[in-house]
Amino acid sequence: MSINQHEIEHVAKLARLTLRDDEKQLFTGQMEAILAYVETLNELNTDDIAPTSHAVPMENAFRPDCVAPSIGHDRALANAPDKNETYFRVPPVIE
């Protein structure tokens, strides 16, 4: 697979990167090398290899969910810069 400088510019724009002309040329060569390596990996026969999501066996390490005593609203909100009854008041994130 071949990659050109226009595609590098497109990827840079998506990543919100500003690249100099020499960087575009450098990254074009590097991306071509990476894609060539991936192509060689695609040639491997993986029919007898089971799909994996982790290299080592893993299990969830959840703790039991049980009710435990906690601090009350008054104590939790004692140092809050702004509150509304029993809730923290925070600045809006989305307008």
Swiss-Prot record:
Allows the formation of correctly charged Asn-tRNA(Asn) or Gln-tRNA(Gln) through the transamidation of misacylated Asp-tRNA(Asn) or Glu-tRNA(Gln) in organisms which lack either or both of asparaginyl-tRNA or glutaminyl-tRNA synthetases. The reaction takes place in the presence of glutamine and ATP through an activated phospho-Asp-tRNA(Asn) or phospho-Glu-tRNA(Gln). This is Aspartyl/glutamyl-tRNA(Asn/Gln) amidotransferase subunit C. It catalyses: L-glutamyl-tRNA(Gln) + L-glutamine + ATP + H2O = L-glutaminyl-tRNA(Gln) + L-glutamate + ADP + phosphate + H(+); L-aspartyl-tRNA(Asn) + L-glutamine + ATP + H2O = L-asparaginyl-tRNA(Asn) + L-glutamate + ADP + phosphate + 2 H(+). The lineage of its organism: Bacteria, Pseudomonadati, Thermodesulfobacteriota, Desulfuromonadia, Geobacterales. One of its GO terms (biological process) is translation. SUPFAM superfamilies: Glu-tRNAGln amidotransferase C subunit. One of its GO terms (molecular function) is ATP binding. Keywords: ATP-binding, Ligase, Nucleotide-binding, Protein biosynthesis. Heterotrimer of A, B and C subunits. It comes from Trichlorobacter lovleyi (strain ATCC BAA-1151 / DSM 17278 / SZ). InterPro entries: Asp/Glu-ADT_sf_sub_c, GatC. Pfam families: GatC. Belongs to the GatC family. NCBIfam families: gatC (TIGR00135). Its EC number is 6.3.5.-.
